Amino acid sequence: MRLSYIFVVVATIITNCDIASASLRAIMSDTASGNGLGTRILRQTNDSDDLEPIRHAMLDMELLEKIAKDPKYAEEVFGNWRHNGQTKAEMENRLQSNGLLGKYRFIIDRYAEHLANSE
């Protein structure tokens, strides 16, 4: 018995949780039927929902690093937040949900000062 066949059988059993679907006939019929399942299985996955919170946290962290380093950029971003109606509490909640509030609390305080000065 070929080692590659053993890997295919084990992977099929793990994927389907069904020993009957691991027979050579079942594996070959799925591949030979022309549905392209064997070559397109990765294209059918939708990982954007799983990785979306991580991407948002990374974008927030990059943005906050730029704000911390560049005061002119900070004023521009604060102006955008104010223009879009973001309150201090909403920004605190956003950073809290991403786990960034502890590290970047000073930026929220600077945003509160910006809001007070712009009114």
UniProtKB/Swiss-Prot annotation:
It is found in: Secreted; Host cytoplasm; Host nucleus. One of its GO terms (cellular component) is host cell nucleus. Glycans are attached at residue 46. A motif (RxLR-dEER) lies at residues 40-77. Residues 1-22 form the signal peptide. InterPro entries: RXLR (IPR031825). Secreted effector that suppresses pattern-triggered immunity (PTI) in plant host. This is Secreted RxLR effector protein RXLR-C04.
